[in-house]
Structure formats: structure tokens, C-alpha cells
């Protein structure tokens, strides 16, 4: 399978830029891994259906694969404690 291309939302790019260097390195390696296999993350359910989450230790990368365009849209990166609430807020515009 061809490696997917990453598309970062402005919010995801901003969040990655603010991470500590060791976490940033871990997140980048995890993104590279999910670009090779976009289905490797967990499917989200309920109001977050259609999105996936990839674990990077205590952090989560929330993304949406697009097989037709061979892209992966990275929506958010954050600590597992609050990333899903942040995603809900992002999706509802709050």
C-alpha cells in the first residue's frame, strides 16, 4: 500500500509545536506509522464516529483517513485525559 500524505489542521499543527521535544518526537514517529497503515488506530464511536485515534503513550492523535485521496487529516493531538473533549468542542464550534 502507498504511504498516505498527512494533512494537519491549524489546531493540530499548533498543538504539536507546543509539545515538549521528547513527546514531539514520539508523536512524529507515531504519525509516520499511521501514514503507512491508516486503519491501525482505533475507531471512535458515537458522536465521534468517522474519526480514529492512535495511541502515542499517554497522548492521542485524532485523525480521519481518506482512502480515495490517500490522505490522513490530523485533527488534534493531546493528552488522553482531555483530547476527546477538545475534539467535541472543535466539532461543535464551542
Residue ranges of predicted features:
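Enrichment for repetitive, rod-forming helical segments
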Residues: 31, 59-62, 87-88
